[in-house]
Amino acid sequence: GYITNFGKAHLEGFGGVEGVIKGKSELYDHLIADKKFIFFNADDPIQLKKLSSYPGKFGYSSLDTKNYKIDLLGAHPFVKLETEEAIISTQLIGSYNFTNCAAAVLIGKYFNIPMEDIKNAIEAYVPQNNRSQIIDKKEYYIVLDAYNANPNSMEAALEHFNNLPGNAKVVFLGDMFELGEKAIEEHQNIVDLVSGMNFDKVYLVGQNFTKTRSNFTKFATFEELSGFLKNNKLKKGKLLIKGSRGMALERILDYL
């Protein structure tokens, strides 16, 4: 078994981050009870602590030489990583995708898949379904990451987009769902983060974002946004589109 991370997702159902950690850790509890094998990120202190005394594990790390070493070489914009045997250049944007790639390498290694095959498979993968997609559309360079969103993934996407070279950057952010009583607080945290970044325009879409304190342009519904886009052509440049599945912000592409 493998757990990717313990983040701020599904807070409504789990009652907070501690509930997320407890719920996801039940996978570890089950595997340990049955003496099964666990793959893990040895650079994650939560995973490392929970598995410290369990022998049936195989981890990757950029720091700890007791585990299989995998380093992030860069994400400008695509993730490039170095294993003990190869350098892998992916078609996945953002350093936040490094752990996904590293886990794929680790599991492949455990099952004795040749590194050349692991490298070729990861390098050939092109993201689809609104997940970390790069789209060149007319005069726009678009980062489409509208499959889903939570505070951690939204923060990571924004930091990556902010660090891309060039100017004329426009951001569309849709509501994050399943945050329960933390919804407005977490949306305000995102707005505060964006306020310190260098974007030409920021458009917020959804009931939660409209309740935040900011000077950004807000739309309570997608229909309000689409009406705006019909009458206001965006300048040539880079666009980030990020939101939860229920917001379906990929529809923005129809108005460009």
Regions found by a protein language model. Give the residues of each.
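Active-site loop-to-helix "anion-binding N-cap" substructures in soluble metabolic enzymes
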Residues: 204, 219, 244
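Short glycine-rich anion-binding loops that position phosphate/pyrophosphate groups of nucleotides
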Residues: 7-9, 43-45, 148-149, 176-177, ...
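Amphipathic, non-transmembrane alpha-helical secondary structure
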Residues: 25, 29, 155-162, 188, ...
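Glycine/threonine-rich flexible loop motifs
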Residues: 12-18, 154, 180-185, 250-251
